[in-house]
Amino acid sequence: MNYQDTLDYMEWNKTKYEISHKPPKPNFNIYYNCIYWAFLGINVGSEQNKHRPVLVTRHQPNPSICTIIPITSQRLNDSYSFHIDLENFNGTVMVEQMRVIDIRRIDKPIIVNKKTISITQNDWNKISQQIISLYSMKPLPDSEQESPKKVLTTV
């Protein structure tokens, strides 16, 4: 770890401490399919981190957590099917990075014309399709003779 990484990590720990001592409920409403700023922290490898836009996809049954999908701050315009360039926001939803966070990580809504930005029906359809594709369980093997397909590599 270099000096700058150490400073970034120390700054994130300070921010995380402040987040953990915020009131349990934000002073704004959190709506499904809307875009907010959230603190995702300092993460490992390719995990999305920092203070970045996120799409809230679920906010129940536990009201202290919500499911989010990180959004890039610029459109990626790449060929990955699980990266959806949004119609109403200059960013790309990274469906493969979907996760659950504490609602205290959500900083504030992204507002345009006095309204929290939401996704379009077309965006919703594309994102939904990719969630099903990426996160639905694969069928079990037909017989005990078949072994499950290796997905992750081992050391």
Regions found by a protein language model. Name each.
Residues 1-12, 84-155:
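C-terminal terminal-subdomain/extension
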Residues 44-88:
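Compact nucleic-acid interaction/catalytic patches
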Residues 19-26:
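Short alpha-helix capping/helix-loop boundary micro-motifs
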Residues 32-33:
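Loop/turn positions that initiate beta-strands
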